[in-house]
C-alpha cells in the first residue's frame, strides 16, 4: 500500500472527525487485523470528491443546560482542486495546504466560517427563556494544525490543531480559540474509530454575552445578577465510530456513524446562574447519521 494513499485516507477521516467529534468516514485496515488491503488505483479519495449527509443529535438546549433537544444537522466534506473542505460545528473550514506524498508529518491551514445559535432558539427552561433570547453569531476565523501519520501502525494518525474565530455579526462581538488533539485509527477496511479532546478559551465579550446576568435579565427571570469574565470555559471529549456500508471507503458510497460526546463547563461557564442554578456543568450528547461520498 503506497504511503500516499494512507495519508489521503487519514486526511479524509480526520477532516470528518472534528464536528465536536463530528462525522468520520472509514479508513484502511490495520495490517495486524486484516492484512494489507489489495492495491487499488481507482480510489475516490485520490481525486476530487464530496461527501454529503445528515445526522440527528440529542444535545443540551443551550450550553450549560440540563434539558436536551433533538436536532438534525447537515454534513458537507470534500476535496476540490486540492482544497480540503472540512466540517465544523455550525460551519466549515478549508485546508489550503497540499499534503506531501508519503510524508510523516502534514500541515493544515485555512479559513473557517460558521454560525452560533446558543440561546438563540429552542430554550426549554422557562426561567432562562424569560431572561431573553440572544442573537445568532456569525463567526469568521482561521484553522491550522499538524498531523503525524503512521504513529502506531501504517494507517493511523495523531493530529494537533487550533481554531480561532471572531463574531462579525455583532452578537457577542468577541474572540474564541480552541486547541484540540485527535487520534484516528481503522479497525477494518469498513470500521473506523476516532477520539478527540479539546478545550475552549473565550474573551470577556463572549463571557459577558453568554454567561453574565444583567439587571434587566435578572428582573425578567428572577436569576441573580452575575458578571462573567473571560477564560477557559469548557473542555470536551468525544468519540465516533463509523461503518462503511460497501466495506471499503475507497469506492465511496454510503457510510453510517454513531457519536458520543462529554463536555464539562469550567470557571464562569460553570458558575453562571444559567448553568449553576438552571442547568448542569456536565454536558452529554449523542447522535447517529449517514453520509454519501461521490
Question: Each predicted region: which residue ranges?
Answer:
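Outer-membrane beta-barrel transmembrane domain signature
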Residues: 82, 146-148, 167-255, 262-270, ...
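Residues that define the transmembrane beta-barrel architecture of outer-membrane proteins
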Residues: 48, 68-74, 105, 134-140, ...
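Short loop/turn motifs that connect adjacent beta-strands in outer-membrane beta-barrel proteins
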Residues: 31, 38-49, 64, 83-107, ...
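Extracellular loop and loop/strand-boundary signature of outer-membrane beta-barrel proteins
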Residues: 60-62, 95-97, 126-131, 164-168, ...
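Flexible, solvent-exposed coil segments and beta strand-coil junctions
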Residues: 52-57, 77, 120-126, 156-163, ...
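Cleavable N-terminal export/targeting peptides
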Residues: 1-46
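Transmembrane beta-barrel strands of outer-membrane/channel proteins
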Residues: 50-58, 87-89, 111-115, 160-166, ...
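Membrane-embedded beta-strands of outer-membrane beta-barrel proteins
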Residues: 52, 74-76, 94, 142-144, ...
